[in-house]
């Protein structure tokens, strides 16, 4: 014990010339540990235990805080100021979070703008609908009546009709265009676009032979009535030619004997013109 007591006069703190950090760092960082370890030095006897304890307490406080070569993460634990700096950094980063949290606000502002745009578009559509002219019954009747008479109007006629029914020439023009299109579409749906074939032409043929006997009592008036019904013009020249045909038929029938024929038109070969 005597040897150890003589050696304890030279403590590790005196040899290394280390400053006493119990008041500076130990009070801040190792305060609870000193309170918990405070009763232990009282149990130990002699200055050796006290000096060794001081040396052990002083060494761990310096090595992890300032020796950054072994552990690069110790720079964050260098001092309480660093921790405060990190906290300040977090506090400084808080406003951007607030700004990011406030970032959806423009979207909320944009939605009313979009609504306004949609409302504006709806307003335009409403204006376009309002621009549509509703014709009265009198105006429609007059337009349809004029359309049946004349499907295309010139500029003066259009202006005159517009002044009569209290419309603008442009409105009259558009109405005529739309009505022509409607009529054309209606005809196309009903199949009226196909032009009908012309009716066959009817030709009036005088009856010269009836029941195997020539008809001598055929008069010009009967022929005129027949041709009038058929739509063929009748003239005096055609009546004279008919009389000439009757005369030739009588002469030929008197000169030649009557033979029974299979068809009454065979006698037409004996006629002379």
Curated annotation (Swiss-Prot):
Phenotype when the gene is knocked out: Mutant embryos do not form any insulin-expressing cells in the pancreas throughout development, and instead accumulate incompletely differentiated beta cells. Simultaneous knockout of NKX6-1 and NKX2-2 is not distinguable from the single NKX2-2 knockout.
Acidic residues biased stretches: 20-38
Pfam families: Homeodomain
InterPro entries for this protein: HD, HD_metazoa, Homeobox_CS, Homeobox_NK-like, Homeodomain-like_sf
UniProt keywords, alphabetically: Activator, Developmental protein, DNA-binding, Homeobox, Nucleus, Transcription, Transcription regulation
Principal place of residence: nucleus
The entry's DNA-binding region: 128-187
Gene Ontology CC annotation, any one: nucleus
Tissues showing expression: Expressed in restricted areas of the developing CNS: the hindbrain and forebrain, and pancreas.
Cell compartment(s), UniProt: Nucleus
UniProt cross-references to Gene3D superfamilies, sorted A to Z: Homeodomain-like (1.10.10.60)
One term of GO molecular function: DNA-binding transcription activator activity, RNA polymerase II-specific
Disordered: annotated segments: 1-56, 91-131
GO-annotated biological processes: astrocyte differentiation; cell development; cell differentiation; central nervous system neuron differentiation; digestive tract development; endocrine pancreas development; negative regulation of neuron differentiation; nervous system development
Recorded family membership: Belongs to the NK-2 homeobox family.
The protein's role, per its UniProt record: Transcriptional activator involved in the development of insulin-producting beta cells in the endocrine pancreas. May also be involved in specifying diencephalic neuromeric boundaries, and in controlling the expression of genes that play a role in axonal guidance. Binds to elements within the NEUROD1 promoter.
Quaternary structure (record): Interacts with OLIG2.
Domain topic, free-text comment: The homeodomain is essential for interaction with OLIG2.
Protein name from the UniProt record: Homeobox protein Nkx-2.2
Species: Mus musculus (Mouse)
């Amino acid at each position: 014990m005597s040897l150890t007591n003589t050696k304890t006069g030279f403590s590790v703190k005196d040899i290394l010339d280390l400053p006493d950090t119990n008041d500076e760092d130990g009070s801040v960082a190792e305060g609870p540990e000193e309170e918990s370890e405070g009763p232990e030095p009282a149990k130990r006897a002699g200055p050796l235990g006290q000096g060794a304890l001081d040396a052990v307490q002083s060494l761990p406080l310096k090595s992890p805080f300032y020796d950054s070569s072994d552990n690069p993460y110790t720079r964050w634990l260098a001092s309480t100021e660093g921790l405060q700096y990190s906290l300040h950094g977090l506090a400084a980063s808080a406003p951007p979070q607030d700004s990011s949290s406030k970032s959806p606000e423009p979207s909320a502002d944009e939605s009313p703008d979009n609504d306004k745009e949609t409302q504006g578009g709806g307003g335009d559509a409403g204006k376009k609908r309002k621009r549509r002219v509703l014709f009265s019954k009198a105006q429609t009747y007059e337009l349809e009546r004029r359309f049946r008479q004349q499907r295309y109007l010139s500029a003066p006629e259009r202006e005159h009709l517009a002044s009569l029914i209290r419309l603008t020439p442009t409105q009259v023009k558009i109405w005529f265009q739309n009505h022509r299109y409607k009529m054309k579409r209606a005809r196309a749906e009903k199949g009226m676009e196909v032009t009908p074939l012309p009716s066959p032409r009817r030709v009036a043929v005088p009856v010269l032979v009836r029941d195997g006997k020539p008809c001598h009592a055929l008069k010009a008036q009967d022929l005129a009535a027949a041709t009038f019904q058929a739509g063929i013009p009748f003239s005096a020249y055609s009546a004279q030619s008919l009389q000439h045909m009757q005369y030739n038929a009588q002469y030929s029938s008197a000169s030649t004997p009557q033979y029974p024929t299979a068809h009454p038109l065979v006698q037409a070969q004996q006629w002379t013109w």
